[in-house]
Amino acid sequence: MIKCNVTTCGVITSSAEEKTSKEGEKFISFSMMVPFEGKDGTVKEQYISVSAPGNAQSAANYSAGRRVTVSGVLYIRKHDNNTYLNLRTDANIEINDSTTPDRLVGSMEFRGKISKKGVKDFNSKKGKPMQSFSAFSSDKNVENYEFTWVSFINLSPIHEEYLAADKYVEVHGDLQLDVFKGELQLECKVNSVAPWELNKTAGANAEQQPS
């Protein structure tokens, strides 16, 4: 599971439409695009699906081409080897001027499994101890599992048994996004790490391994 509390600003690419949930409640849905430039100079135009309380009348305010700022809960998952970002908000959606900069900032809550490479200890250029590790979250799509990887940087090294290769962890930290060769890279600056105690359902999913 990868869940983030974020604020993002971008351009609406498909006008809002009224929809009805399984519970019969009306809401609006639209897509927006936020561009990200990576350290390697490549750019990724990332599309985000947004859902918010509303109806056909309020949907008319959010037409394609308008720049908006949305705050809410962002869910990140893989499907058909593509990374999808779905943002749910209960807050007011702010309509912005064209000069308002693109952005996506916030915090991340991650539950998943540390890679077989484990945790690397190293020193920064200023000699400060740090750690880095990668971990994945798995999602089941029909009969197949897909894996979303996150790269973590920990500025306060932890040397506990639960922070090691093939261990399940729950991580909270600052969401950071990068682009490498035109593909979105998920990163997180760690604030806290704890062992993730799996229930039977989560355990069955988490036992799946990327090939």
PLM features: residue spans?
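Acidic, gly/ser/pro-rich intrinsically disordered tails
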Residues: 1-5, 9, 16-26, 37-44, ...
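Intrinsically disordered, low-complexity regulatory segments
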Residues: 49-51
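N-terminal intrinsically disordered, low-complexity, charge/repeat-rich segments that act as generic
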Residues: 53-55
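Flexible glycine-rich surface loops and low-complexity tracts that mediate binding to linear polymers
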Residues: 65-79, 167-180
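Generic beta-strand structural signal
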Residues: 66, 83-85, 106, 131
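Short, structured interface segments
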Residues: 71-100
